């Protein structure tokens, strides 16, 4: 829409931009999440390591636009590992964990402090994948025991409320160690165990089963997925007998196979991944040996990851979320 000449002015008294609608001057309000929060914040919660305890309840955070070591945020209300996460611009939600639990917990991303009880998943499980838009969070797949009882369940929650998850539909396959990312309309689940290169998609605001999107460049279990509103990235993961440092990317609004983006700084799997509108970040993982490394990339470019800093403790199988990802 063209703005008529002279219809915009800056009011020196109120220090606001104003628009003239033909009868009166009106203030133009603006809001950016990054201005309100001091920059997109990435949060890493839970995990498994060897110091100071095997199962960690630690929650760390970073400011994604900077570099440097993570800072302590608080503790998980329910201790475990192999959970996954989703978030709005204000609230982060962590679902499931090992030993298999149906507990969902939440934090307020812009503050610090311990997580609180949100509700329950429809099925106790761990190594599920998570994603969200600004209002709805999804948790998919996972398993209930090391013997390999896997699920294709997709649950959903309304992030701004509390309460139990509800059934959304099913993935195209029964899978664990799956990862997720999203735009504001479409959710993507990729990889998993048993080892697969399959990528599924759903429309977040509806209910129903997932459909096939395409394939990763290689089959991987335990990759870390993150996205802005355009591009989804999948980094690392396990290939039978070894681990991977490969980063793939997709264009979320299309269908098709993933393309090579570059490499992580280390070969590792079971890391947490989160993003702002410009950067993707991976933290922790197993290489072999538990890692505290944090890597980052510029999402709309291609190339290898660069060192960001370190988590407060070494661990893998941790959840990650942000208040600036592609679903918002």
Regions found by a protein language model. Give the residues of each.
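Polar, enzyme-active/binding microenvironments
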Residues: 1-328
